[in-house]
Regions:
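Single conserved hydrophobic/aromatic residue that forms the stacking wall/gate
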Residues: 234-245
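NAD(P)-dependent Rossmann-like dehydrogenase/reductase catalytic/cofactor-binding core
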Residues: 5, 10, 201-236
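Rossmann-like NAD(P)(H) cofactor-binding subdomain of soluble oxidoreductases
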Residues: 42, 52-128
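NAD(P)+-binding Rossmann beta1-loop-alpha1 motif at the extreme N-terminus of oxidoreductases
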Residues: 2-56
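Internal alpha-helical scaffold of NAD(P)-dependent oxidoreductase catalytic cores
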Residues: 9, 44, 48-51, 128-215
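Short phosphate-binding/catalytic loops that engage adenosine nucleotides
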Residues: 32-33, 112, 158, 198
């Protein structure tokens, strides 16, 4: 890339789901050149491709061989299953995946240059996020590619870190507790409130204050209520049944 800016790189996205959609749009807005989007679903591939002014395909064998960087953002099982087909004929490019739970060595034996570009955030197609505050964790098998991935991530975010596969696995697990399990608690709360004719909106100030607290306090110090003692004594019988079940 000597003499050229990183924005001149030709990038292909393998996947057009929640993360891929947000990441591709963010890169496009920063001037990066997205040349193609692949998805098994035509609607998803076409919609994202139109947004970032790229070509699209729903056939793996039609994925361009001309891109310099391939960003794979698929469900874990699909990625592992399709990996040999995905890289076929394109082994000399730089390949990265965006998964928190998949180690970098998944690429070994398939491509020479490889790494990970992991933005740790929850993504939805319908909701755009501020990438400036999203932590990116990068890893690469070659130091020059680590620097390149850091430069790409730094074009989007102020928070860019190197992390090993082992570290990233722990990050991902912590993120599951912080986000996915927390949201599942909201689902249980919403079901309980609905059963008794109460609006979930009543919980929003509580949710917001709980989140704000941990910006200033350690999570343990911020904990209040029966959970401090892991006690269900002061929780009503209907709620106890929900928690226990």
């Amino acid at each position: 890339m000597a003499g050229r800016s990183i924005e001149d790189m030709s990038i292909a996205f393998i996947g057009a789901g929640n993360l891929a959609t947000n990441l591709a749009k963010a890169l496009y807005r920063k001037g990066f050149r997205i040349v193609q989007v692949y998805s098994r679903t035509k609607e998803s591939a076409q919609e994202l491709a139109q947004t970032v002014e790229a070509a699209y395909t729903t056939e793996l064998q039609a994925v361009t061989k001309e891109a310099q960087l391939y960003i794979v953002s698929l469900k874990d099982a699909a990625f592992v299953e399709l990996l040999p087909q995905i890289v076929s004929g394109k082994e000399n490019a730089l390949w990265v995946h965006t998964a928190g739970s998949i180690p970098m060595n998944i690429w070994q034996g398939h491509v020479a240059r490889h790494g990970v570009l992991y933005p740790m955030q929850t993504f939805s197609k319908q909701r755009e996020v501020d990438f400036g505050q999203i932590p990116f964790f990068v890893e690469g098998n070659l130091e020059e590619d680590v620097r390149l991935l850091k430069d790409i991530a730094s074009a989007l975010s102020e928070k860019v870190y190197e992390a090993s596969s082992e570290q990233r696995k722990s990050l991902h697990l912590a993120a599951v507790f912080t986000c996915n399990f927390t949201n599942h608690m909201y689902v249980l709360a919403a079901e309980l409130l609905k059963k008794y004719g109460l609006p979930f909106e009543a919980m929003l100030p509580l949710i917001d204050e709980t989140a704000r607290k941990v910006h200033e306090l350690e999570p343990l110090a911020a904990q209040t209520g029966p959970a401090v003692r892991l006690s269900l004594i002061h929780i009503s019988e209907p709620t106890r049944r929900v928690v226990i079940s």
